[in-house]
From Swiss-Prot:
Top enzyme class: translocase
Residue stretches spanning the membrane: 1-21, 34-54, 63-85, 89-111, 128-148, 156-176, 211-231
Protein known as: NADH-ubiquinone oxidoreductase chain 4
Enzyme Commission number(s) of this protein: 7.1.1.2
Similarity comment: Belongs to the complex I subunit 4 family.
Natural source organism: Crotalus adamanteus
Gene that specifies this protein: MT-ND4
Amino acid sequence: PIAGSMVLAAILLKLGGYGIIRMMQILPTTKTDLFLPFIVLALWGAILANLTCLQQTDLKSLIAYSSISHMGLVVAAIIIQTPWGLSGAMALMIAHGFTSSALFCLANTTYERTHTRILILTRGFHNILPMATTWWLVTNLMNIAIPPSMNFTGELLIMSALFNWCPTTIIMLGLSMLITASYSLHMFLSTQMGPTMLNNQTEPMHSREHLLIALHLAPLLMISLKPELVI
């Protein structure tokens, strides 16, 4: 069920990060070298999840692995125990909660009309549902973390915190963000561009679907304009 996927990506996936934040408050702040293996594993896990996204043919699986890759950045930022890292992790968790939930909602909108989640079979929607294509574009750009979105604020703070802690981490962070942009654009082009594979008549998007996406993106845009609300 799509509702379960949306709740899982938006709320339940963030409980692990919240637990780590609480645990870090009772651990010594001067022993970050002890956490070096965990930081490396978190960043490496983010890269592997991103590479897995590039191999996915199932739309829902691609979005799910995307959520895992973002949580790798969050874990690495929390573990170094700096104010910038903590602020960036909180910003990215909140922003990604809205973004991933909106992506799952759009995936369900596509599935209800095509009855498949295979990327190559869902193409050509820009001719049939142009408004849905607009929602896909905006949400994918948020997932890539373009400025001035909250996703960009979170990733910038995380990148700055990790670079100040160890400049070498910029290599893994840069690679992760490059692959994120690649699979996000691949997902958009695969589901929206090209000739349509549908032979039957497709019904337009309902008002409730537009409202649901707007209720995801409106708070995200508001927080992006005023980040002091959450960090």
